[in-house]
Amino acid sequence: MVNDLKNKTVVITGGAQGIGLATADKYLAKGAKVCILVDIDAKHGATAVNDLNGKYGNNRAEFIKCDVTADLEAVSSKIFNKYKTVDVLINNAGILNEHNLRKTIEINVTALMEWSVKFFDHMRKDNGGKGGTIINLASIYGFRVDPFLPIYQGSKFAVMGYTRSLGHKYRCERYGVRVVAVCPGFTDTILTTGVKVREDQIMQKDFEKMLEATPWQQVEDVAKAAVDVYEKAESGTAWLIEGSKPIVEV
């Protein structure tokens, strides 16, 4: 069965640029009714919405300035009051900073879980909702291990475990909410620019050698994967998109 994005209301965290913005573009091209971009970056957010509305028509995209670690209640209330029903939440906001453990966990794990809980309860069919889909942006580092970025890897392992449990078949059948993960390989974004390991220059040089040998991809590749995953993935599953190749379940 292919799930259809036509007329769906979509919320994307970290949607002002990069993977989030590219995904909004692909979802609107597939017929989504509206994409609501929430992001702390107001400048890029305003530009993103202007570009999307210029391309797809007025009111197809909206930007809401938001710190995902602090503004969930206010922003979700605003969204639910205006749109009544949200069909898709994409938890895309994230950071890669080995020098700030607490912030990494707050954004990559805690906020992602909190937004998932809020929108899961909104979507629950047993709670008056209409069902829906939550897509969590994990990473190849949600299931692969190397020695370079343990804090980031730990955060993404948490996302994978959370997604598989929240999206468990039992829960999906009971509540009508599908939860899946997209696991991008190295992608050309601000997130992956100038990444520094925490320890020393020897480790940094080895990390950079690894990056040179790694297949890279563009944000559009991940956005297309987010469409493919929405259309075909079963709840509780996780999908790899790496080196611009077709998605593969992991």
Give the residues covered by each predicted segment.
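Residue(s) in the substrate-gating loop at a strand-loop-helix junction
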Residues: 139
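Active-site helix of classical SDR
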Residues: 116, 155
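C-terminal helical subdomain
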Residues: 181, 200-250
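Substrate-binding pocket helix/loop in short-chain dehydrogenase/reductase
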Residues: 100-104
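Conserved glycine-rich cofactor-binding loop
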Residues: 16-17
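Conserved NAD(P)H cofactor-binding loop of Rossmann-fold oxidoreductase domains
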Residues: 92-97
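Conserved glycine-rich Rossmann-like NAD(P)H-binding loop of the short-chain dehydrogenase/reductase
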Residues: 32-47
